[in-house]
Every structure is written in structure tokens, then in C-alpha cells.
Amino acid sequence: QNQSSAASDVYKRQGYRDTSFNLLPSIFKTFGPTGYSLIIQSLTLLIVLFVLENKKKYTYLKDSLVFFILIFTPLSLFLLNDSFNLLDKNNKSEQISVVIVQGNSPCPGAKNRCNNERARIYESHINLTKSISSEKDLIIWPESSTGFNNDPLIHDRVLTDIQIEVERLNSYFLIGGDRPIREANFENYGLFINNEGTIVDQYLKQHPVPFGEYIPFRRYLDWIPSLSLVPRDMIRGEQEKIFQMGSHKLASVISFEGSFQRYIRGSVQAGAEIIVILTNQASYGESGMSDQFILMSRANAISNDRPVIHSAITGKSAFIDNNGKVLSQTNLFTSEILNENINPINSQTPFSLFGNYFNYLIVVIAFVIFLRKRVLS
């Protein structure tokens, strides 16, 4: 899946880039990544206008004061809540032990092909899982680690292999994969197996990558040779899914969806205490896009006050706490396992409760100002 061009505009947002410095987490929790981006860019614009537009300095000073009031009112309320616990804030003290199994691919990349690639990817993941020596609460296999002839939902031999490891490790499993549906379609799934070896439920990816997981207007574009690399169109899932793991709740988003705040926030609203991103980043190559994706996961972890588990088939995989700190991560194009103890969290932030309310407020105010100027003129 060549996700590079489709995701590039999302990666450029200021709020995702600045998480590399872990700046002002309270702003992320109050306004979210997009709100943070709006604030930084608007402040920059106001400063430039104030410096360059001598005739309108009073107007821009007044606009700046209004803008600062709009920023600091909700931010002050959040900081007040942080001090006096006005919102429900319940960080569970019990940790869960989690393992990311990063099985890699023998021939990563959208255009690369090798014999029995899918079978070899599955075998790598099952063999790495067999190397885990002690019991764990949750084992995670990333996107594309199973599927087609190695789908646990369809092929009993695959489910049996996994059930043996479930029993040995007394673990829940969350497993990514894709499933052909007739000749023209497929599903991209996250399959949840409980610690008794039963397939409990699955999450189906809702947001396909344009020209990577489906071809818009395929019937009119079939003459383009390179589109043969995408022979099937993904069937969209309908909603978020919450998986119950004992007393804890987790949810998955799949790959490209991790670029969009609404899927992670939607899972938090549905009750998720841990967010898992299943992804296949093979087409990113040695570029910086794997690191950029982790930055996005960090921004979303801070904004929603949730730990995020970033599981990538070819790397980089990472454990990220609710403050956006990377606890541990893997390298690119390696076969390895990554262990961490994670604290489930079920508190709320202004962003997780109200979404991009600040952005909409600014749009409404701008529209009112526009109408007022039209009336006065």
C-alpha cells in the first residue's frame, strides 16, 4: 500500500510535528492537534500583520487580544481541572503486560514481490510468538500479518496454531490481516481472540487509502497500468469496536486511520482505555515517514490522554504513554518482539469530550465578523 502521497498533507500539520519536543501538552489536551496547529499559525499571522500593517495596528492588536482570550479561557479551565480534578480522572493502577510482534516482510514495498510472501510473513509472526517465554496479557500482531490463506477466521489450521500460543501464554491476541471478499473486494481487519482461544470480535478498517486500498472511479481509470497494483477495493467497516480484555477496554484503528483524529477520539468516546494502531509501513522504505507516523500517534496520545500502542509489520513499532513519551520502539525492517507494561486510562480531556470545538468557534466568529463588515459597508 503506497500511503505516502495520500498522507503527506496530514503529516505537515504543525500539531503533529511539534510533539517531537513534547511542547505544552495542556494545549494538545485542550484543543487537539488541529487546534494546536490553528493556534500556532494564527499567532504567527497576527504577529506578521501587526509588524507589517502600520495603518491597522490597532485593529490587529484588538484581534490578537480577542484571540488570546479565546485560547486562554478553555485552557485555564483545563488547568484548573487538572489541579482540582473537576473532570473524571481515573488512571487505573493495574498494569497490563503487552508484546508487539514485529515479524517484518521478506520483500517489503508496494511493488516488490517474492514467493510465498504472505505465508512467510505469517510464519515469522507465529515463530516469534513461540519465542515468548512467559505469560503476557496481550499479544499484538500488526496489519497484514495474517490474511488470505492464513486467515484465522477462515482457516482452522491457522486458528489452531494461535490457540496453542494463547493457551501457553494465557494471553489475549489482537491480530491484523486482510480477507478477500469475492473477486473485486477485500476487508482489512483487526481480529480479537480472548485468552480461551475464542474469536470474540473483529474491527474492520473504515477509511481506505485512495489508490492504495481502493481506486476512486475505477471503471474510468482501469486503462492506467500502475493501477493493476491495486486489484481489489476495500469494503469499509461501519464503526469503532471496543474489545473487552478482563476489566480493561481496548480499541484498534488500522494504519491510515491513525492519521485522522476522529477515529482515535471516537474509540475513546466509546470507552477505550488503550488505543492500538495496527499498520503496515513497508512502502515507507527508509524515509522519515515511520517516525512521522509515531509523532502523530504521540500527538493523539496526549490529546486523548491515552496510551497508544503502535504496531508496524516492518517497523517502527512503539509503546507511547498518555503523555506522548515513547517508552520503547523497534528499528526498521527487523524481526523482533517489544515488551512493555501499560497503564489503561479512562479519564477525559476537553478534546476527547468536545473534539475540534475551537476550530468551529473560530469559523463562526470569522463568519460573524464578515457579515458585520458587509452590513457596515
Residue ranges of model-derived segments:
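Single conserved hydrophobic/aromatic residue that forms the stacking wall/gate
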Residues: 1-7, 11
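Juxtamembrane membrane-water interface segments that cap and precede transmembrane helices
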Residues: 14-27, 344-346
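Membrane-interface loop-to-helix entry segments
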Residues: 26-42, 351-361
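Hydrophobic core of alpha-helical transmembrane segments in multi-pass integral membrane proteins
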Residues: 46, 68-82, 360-371
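Structural signal for the C-terminal ends of transmembrane alpha-helices
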Residues: 47-56, 370-376
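Membrane-interfacial entry segments at the cytosolic side of transmembrane helices
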Residues: 56-70
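Hydrophobic alpha-helical transmembrane segments in integral membrane proteins
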Residues: 67-101, 109
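Solvent-exposed soluble domains appended to multi-pass membrane proteins
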Residues: 112-118, 138-377
